[in-house]
Structures are given as C-alpha cells and as structure tokens.
Curated annotation (Swiss-Prot):
Its biological purpose: Catalyzes the ATP-dependent amidation of deamido-NAD to form NAD. Uses ammonia as a nitrogen source.
Catalysis: reaction(s): deamido-NAD(+) + NH4(+) + ATP = AMP + diphosphate + NAD(+) + H(+)
Molecular-function annotations in GO: ATP binding; glutaminase activity; metal ion binding; NAD+ synthase (glutamine-hydrolyzing) activity; NAD+ synthase activity
Protein name per the record: NH(3)-dependent NAD(+) synthetase
UniProt binding sites for ATP: 51-58, 168, 197, 219
GO biological process, one term: NAD biosynthetic process
Pathway assigned to this chain's UniProt record: Cofactor biosynthesis; NAD(+) biosynthesis; NAD(+) from deamido-NAD(+) (ammonia route): step 1/1
HAMAP family documented for this protein: NadE_ammonia_dep
Species this protein is from: Burkholderia cenocepacia (strain HI2424)
Similarity remark: Belongs to the NAD synthetase family.
Length: 282
C-alpha cells in the first residue's frame, strides 16, 4: 500500500470508530454521564452492572456509571450501580482491583468467583473427548471461557435487578479487536466508545483517579501460562502508536500494517452474526 492508501484507510477507520479530532476531558465526562443517565431512564430500567478488574477502563466506566445514577436519583429517578468483582480464584493484582473499587465508590459491590464454573467447563470439554493441540491452545481457550463466565455473571445480576450491562470497550480495543467475543465484548452500552486509550486515561485523571489506576499496565490476564501479560505484547505495537493512528497522526509503516491486520482480522467481532443477506460483503 502507498502512503496515500494508508492515510485513506486511517481516515475511514477513525470515522467508523467515532474518534473526535479534539479532546476535552471535562466535556467528555459531562457528555458521557448525560448519555448514561438519559439512556437508563429511557429504558425504564433501574440498574447499571459492570465488572471491575482494577484497570483504567473499568475504573473509568464504573465511576461514570456511579455519577450517572447519582444524578438520576437527585432528579427523583430510582437508579443504582452494581460493581462486580469477578476474580478467577485469587487475582494476581487484587490490590489494584480494591483500589479501583475505592475510586468508583459503587452503590453495591458483589464478588463472584468464576473459577469453579470456568474450570468445570474445561473439564467437561476434555471429558467429551476433545483434544487440544497444545497446552498453550488449551490455556488460551480456557482464558476465553473465563471472560464469558464473567459476562454470564453480569447478565445474571442485570436480569434479576432490572439492569443493563456496561462494557468497557473503547476505540483502541475496538480497532485491535482485543476483547473476547461474547465475553467482555458482550454488553448493552459502551460509555467509553470513541476514546483512544490515552483519552480514557485523561478522563480517568480528570475524574480524580490516582496515577496507579490511570497508568496501570493494561492486561487481560486470562492466560495462566502467561500471567499478567501486557496487551502491548500481544499487539506488537504500543498503545501510544495505536492512539496516534486513531487520532490521525502519522505512524510508521509497520504500525499501519499491524493495526490494519488486526482491524481486518477482527471485523467479525464488531458485527452482528452474519446471515446470507450479509455475505459476500458489498
């Protein structure tokens, strides 16, 4: 591809992911709290539910959610935010998760250990006769099972509490497809949509998040053979490079190539299930 081709695709992706050319943290906070409050009221439902991992994304989305329900209550609408801790046994960075909960200040906190359910599913797969190709493949699949068990737990609570599940997907993760389909990618509302990773950090900082939360190294921490593996190691590019792409800045050819490969390869994650009316794509 030529430089002009790269730039053309970059502009199209930025528009598709709704990344604004300019950023004002305080304005984004106000806009996103308004969005959350208005949406919940419009549904007639009463509760937001979100899993809090300890990272900046869930911390930021959680604080926005809490502020939105407080606004609704001040206006006479009975609303509540439930933060869920969803460890897989003992979480490696539990201290960070507790710090995040203190920042979010949710109305209610529920803790559900997903390890028994995730391990039981893996055992059932093995007992069925299914054979994994390598221990690494088994570990990867097991990691995605954990992510999906977490979403099952959140939807169970939301279903019982007239609730809506919040997702933490933002433009950088959406661009790279770095989420589990029907796991952490399964949600009803995405208050961080359109933000690059550095802009999520900017919102978190403006909300009063301490630097240990704001600058925590992003990790899905789903694989037991590679605990706390940074997202950037999986990408092969840094978040700064991803964010530069999203914010319309020039990046090296290798960054264009890597970003576009991830974006094209994860297109199915950003779409509803295909039907015969969708394929072949126009």
């Amino acid at each position: 591809m030529t430089s002009a081709d790269y730039a053309s695709r970059q502009r199209a992706i930025i528009a598709e992911l709704n990344v604004a050319p300019h950023f004002d943290a305080e304005a984004e906070i106000a806009r996103r709290i308004d969005f959350l409050a208005q949406y919940l009221r419009s549904t007639g439902l009463r509760t937001y539910v979100l899993g809090i991992s300890g990272g900046v994304d869930s911390s930021t989305a959680g604080r926005l959610a809490q502020l939105s329900v407080e606004r609704l209550r001040a206006d006479g609408y009975d609303a509540r935010f439930i933060a869920m801790r969803l460890p897989n046994g003992v979480q490696n960075d539990e201290e960070d998760a507790q710090r995040a909960l203190a920042f979010v200040r949710a109305d209610e906190v529920l803790t559900v250990d997903v390890k028994p359910a995730a391990d039981a599913m893996l055992r059932s797969l093995v007992a069925s006769g299914h054979a994994f190709e390598t221990p690494a493949q088994q570990d990867f699949v097991h990691g995605n099972i954990k992510a999906r068990e977490r979403m099952i737990a959140q939807y169970a609570v939301a279903g019982a509490r007239r609730g809506i599940v919040i997702g933490t997907d933002h433009a950088a993760e959406s661009l790279m497809g770095f989420f589990t389909k029907f796991g952490d990618g399964g949600a009803d509302i995405l208050p961080l949509a359109g933000l690059s990773k550095r802009r999520v950090r900017g919102v978190a900082r403006a909300l009063g998040g301490e630097e240990l939360i704001v600058m925590k190294v992003p990790t899905a921490d789903l694989e037991e053979l590679r605990p706390l593996r940074p997202d950037e190691h999986a990408y092969g590019v840094t978040y700064d490079e991803i964010d530069d792409f999203l914010e319309g800045k020039p990046v090296a050819d290798r960054v264009y190539e890597t970003v576009l490969r991830f974006y094209d390869g994860s297109r199915h994650k950003r779409a509803l299930p295909y039907t015969m009316f969708d394929w072949p794509a126009a």
